[in-house]
């Protein structure tokens, strides 16, 4: 069996929930989406200023990994359904791809977007998927994200890793 | 060195029942499977219609009382393994698309569902779980194909399973996305929205070398695939279908197929005003003047929308179209939308299909395309 080629970890970030976590318009009920977005901003820079994803476009993919995703919004949607009155905004807020759509829009990323559920280490799994996506030439850069919510909101966190195909000898000489 | 990827077996489930015969009889005759939902209360919703299987008529092998998503995936997986004649399931990784639910209604996490399916079938590793909404099963198939093409494995089981449940139904109802008239009419001027449907399919994807070594017969070749994002809006598709166009264009280019070689497209076609218009516009951008030659149908008009599993169900429908040289119609299409005209299949048509696309899109601007070629 084949061993997949190596990739280069360009930069990483980890952000935690708390009073300083910026809100994300449209995602007001849970820290899940704000954590994912803040991790991206911490990792690659603010979308409105100079950032590492500028000009990447369709060469950039996003993979989000989590065990249970946005359990806060999901549980809220259950409460709404049980009450017989569901807020329409929950329709998209419970979907894991929604925040990725916002990240893709703000950073102009038009490549593949995936969400993967895990039982173990989400970061390891996301990076393994990134390795395969890069090997398949589905993208040249991958933004790998993980989000972990916790019953204690202060323990919730997100990670972001920007990876790319490992530069060959010629690329290394130039840099 | 990259391997060619083939489909050597599949298992399928829909509101029409288990197996390809039931699916073919229903979808390819254009018979909608919608009926009144009885598994939970829908009296307060815009519609009570969904394509749910008649519980008394369907009993998959070794299913317990009440059909569950896991049982659907297991039954489809077993069908696929048997059809392919694959001997040792322990050699097969699995990639499953499934739903994400609150722990209070679904104690088992999505990846634990995959583990249970894999354990029951005796499958190997890796075991992966995609949950990117309506593109999840297409993504699962694409990921499985990537594993085979990269040489990570000789074969893999990939697909998805979904049963209409109270949570999904109520969320779609709250967004006024369900068709109040109880009809899912893709690309029709009078379309009112989507209807949900039970569905599942598992495909055994296998390298050409493995198929030759086993002296097995491939069903179709998975020629190429592509995923894109609209980079436009969290919940709405790009009005001109930019992401759809990019996915179709990339899938064709990667396979070396030109638009004039494409015969059939199984569209995402949810019957919602925004989605169908965007998809039709995207097809025009990608196919140009060849758009009027390519047959298009929206088979959710008969099966309903199986959400996370829809890409696998529709890949199998596309495969059946190629194998039978019969195109499934879009049911209920009476007044086609004229803004971006397509060559609709309104009645079953006998056509040779050397190349066909299956398309899906989801919330967050995600688009996925897989291109099947005759084996």
Give short role names for the model-derived ranges.
Chain A
Residues 1-175:
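Conserved "HGTGT" condensation-loop signature of ketosynthase/thiolase-family condensing enzymes
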